[in-house]
Amino acid sequence: MTCCFSCLNPRTKDIRVDIDNARCNSRYQTDSSVHGSDTTGTESISGILVNGKVNSPIPGGGARSFTFKELAAATRNFREVNLLGEGGFGRVYKGRLDSGQVVAIKQLNPDGLQGNREFIVEVLMLSLLHHPNLVTLIGYCTSGDQRLLVYEYMPMGSLEDHLFDLESNQEPLSWNTRMKIAVGAARGIEYLHCTANPPVIYRDLKSANILLDKEFSPKLSDFGLAKLGPVGDRTHVSTRVMGTYGYCAPEYAMSGKLTVKSDIYCFGVVLLELITGRKAIDLGQKQGEQNLVTWSRPYLKDQKKFGHLVDPSLRGKYPRRCLNYAIAIIAMCLNEEAHYRPFIGDIVVALEYLAAQSRSHEARNVSSPSPEISRTPRRDL
């Protein structure tokens, strides 16, 4: 199937490798070479322009500094009952601040995958960038060797919690909810690529990093690997390869040349996960089907086989025409030649059109509504 965006109502345990030096910014002139770490571990990312204005971290204006004692009290001394999740980076706890605000507190493992540089990059990035589809950083803690990040609490967890290994009593996401999540995630990337100046390359887009609020509106999280994109005559940023296996664009994995089109490939993988309900890498699948992109390639090329890609949990309740559009978008995002992949602005237009068509289809079929039911948010303290 072929499709052009101009037809769609156009408008104007994760595996990571070591992080390199973040891009230093002096009027956006950059030396991307790696010469080892500096003595402070500080990343210079100030001076990002948003809507023509310089955004910079202002003391007292944005993310606040917490003491370790405050965060220990918020989590009741990091009790297991408040544990939301854990990984190679450390643990995430649910907490309640003195103000009564419920938050998510990420306590980094000093020996984990997220190092001091990544911590600083994340604090700076989320202090500079603000959008409805980016998670809000409330504050941080740097007491002694402790490194903690305090985020707004997202009651429905991550996208992967609702796509993979569902509990027997857990209702699968409806088609329309999946499209809503796709549109929101794309808008978040569009903000990073098109509004921030220079553009920000997310570099770690995956279902685990897409958090969901109570209305299933998505927010991108975990900006420790984000990097400022190329400016001027530069076409790419050269960097050590990093990210998550199964999501990385092939040209980036091979050469370390990073562009905004690297994020587009990652987005294609996430969109494929949304359609199929399968993980980017699933060692539980039989040989030849463990890599989602590799497994899907033959089906993406044959419209008659598109149905084989659809998550069985949808039970056939999706508009066939909208599926065709979605797979066309996926195929373009996953093009092995980076310059043939669409820009995120075009993807947003296409997905907004697709989501609108999906809603119209549902409205015409109100006699057989989606099996979507209300879901129970994560437990309170």
From Swiss-Prot:
SUPFAM superfamilies: Protein kinase-like (PK-like)
Region entry Disordered, spans: 362-381
Location of the active site: D204
InterPro entries: Kinase-like_dom_sf, Prot_kinase_dom, Protein_kinase_ATP_BS, Ser-Thr/Tyr_kinase_cat_dom, Ser/Thr_kinase_AS
Gene Ontology terms for molecular function: ATP binding; protein serine kinase activity; protein serine/threonine kinase activity
Top EC class of this enzyme: transferase
Catalytic activity, as annotated: L-seryl-[protein] + ATP = O-phospho-L-seryl-[protein] + ADP + H(+); L-threonyl-[protein] + ATP = O-phospho-L-threonyl-[protein] + ADP + H(+)
This protein's GO CC annotations: plasma membrane
Domain Protein kinase: start-end pairs: 78-354
Lipid tethering residues (S-palmitoyl cysteine): C3
PANTHER family given in the database record: OS07G0668900 PROTEIN, SERINE_THREONINE-PROTEIN KINASE PBL21-RELATED
Protein name, entry field: Probable serine/threonine-protein kinase PBL21
UniProt source species: Arabidopsis thaliana
This protein's encoding gene: PBL21
